[in-house]
Every structure is written in structure tokens, then in C-alpha cells.
Amino acid sequence: QRDIILTAFDLGITHFDLANNYGPPYGSAERNFGQILRSDLAGHRDELIISTKAGWDMWPGPYGELGSRKYLLASLDQSLDRLGLDYVDIFYSHRFDHETPLEETMGALHTAVQSGRALYAGISSYNPQRTREAAAILRDLGTPLLIHQPSYSMLNRWIEREALLDVLADEGVGAIGFSPLAQGMLTDRYLAGIPADSRAAQGKSLAPQWLTDENRERLAALNALAHSR
């Protein structure tokens, strides 16, 4: 992991995107990155954009996930402790919470920025309507919504179909996609089916239903195109 991060930095990559539950175990990605930051990149902090998120399950109980003010700010404090930082550059609401008023969730992001624990506020995986509402709430609070992180790949273009990109353009909000390789499908990992040791076989982040006959045909065609170059 250290070699990957340092090689990326040496090649000009300065944005490192994390979340409280990245692991396993939860928190380990932040903790490991924090150790590498202290040992190898401490003198380069002002060159780096470091982001983290909260929204998915992190600890037991009603305040261990989703979008309550209590959870988001407690999680951010824990993330900063694991990273060994006073602030992150971007703090995201990792997913929309149907059980918490959006005003509360965006208010927590506003507090994170106003308190100096984050420089900018972001959201992830919000649909177009909720994105527009979130941007309006933050605008009224005086903390602009900087960025949205949706899933996006050649096989998953929902942000085009559902006009999320149009909403972001209207609101002046940036976009940075996650899973650009479609959770591994846009590699050669699944060309011959589902390997026994793969995430799809283990029922993790890549659902087997994504590997439809149509997508298999697309993958085979893309693989042939790649090998012809």
C-alpha cells in the first residue's frame, strides 16, 4: 500500500479519497494512509487534497450510520484522529438518509466547514432532486456544495441518463466518479465467468446480477479492442 501511494504521488497524483468504513476492517484505510502521510508525505500536506466520508454503517446503534448530525460529526472527529490530521480538504455525506431531514445532514457539513475540520463540503450518490435540494440548503447556510461523487463507468452511466450532470452544471457543483472500472468488470477479471475468490462470488460490492449476458458481450468486445491496440 505504501509503494502504491508513493508511486502515485511521484507520478503527480495529489488527491487521495477515503471514507470512515474503507477497509476491512472499518477505519483501516484512514489509519494506514495516516501512517504513510506522517512517515513519507508530512512535508507535502499542502500539496494534497485528502477527503473522507461518513454515511454507511460504522458502529452499532442508531447513530452509527446514515446522516444525523451526531453521527456525521462524531465520525469526522474519529476520521481525523485515525488520519492524524487537524482537517480534511473535503468531507462528504456518503449517502442520502431518508430518515433524517436533509437540513440536518447539510447543517452538519456546514458545521464541519465552519469549525475548520473540513475545507469543503461534498455529497456522494445523491439523486438529481436531492442534489439540487442539498445545494440550495448549503447555499443558504453560506457553505457552497463543492462536489458530488457518483458511481460512473462505461457500464454505469446513470448520471447521464438521469441528468445529474445537468443539475451539477446548473448548481456549479463539480463531479468526481467512483468505480470507473465498474467494480472490476472493466478489467480481464470476469471475462471467463466469476472467479471463486472474487468479490462477486463472495456477495460483496460487485453484485452477480451485473454480469449479465449483455455486459459479458460488452466486456468481450472491449477486451478485443484493447488487445488490438
List where the protein language model places each region.
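Short, acidic/polar
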Residues: 1-8, 66-84, 102-104, 131-135
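N-terminal binding-site loop/beta-alpha segment at the start of enzyme catalytic domains
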Residues: 1-48, 114
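Glycine-centered flexible beta-alpha turn that most often forms the glycine-rich phosphate-binding loop
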Residues: 16, 88, 121
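A short, structured active-site edge motif that brings together acidic residues
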Residues: 45-58, 149-152
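Active-site mouth loops of central-metabolism enzymes
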Residues: 57-73, 94-100
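Active-site groove signature of glycoside hydrolases
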Residues: 80-100
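Beta/alpha (TIM)-barrel catalytic core signal, keyed to glycine-rich beta->alpha loops juxtaposed to Asp/Glu
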Residues: 96-229
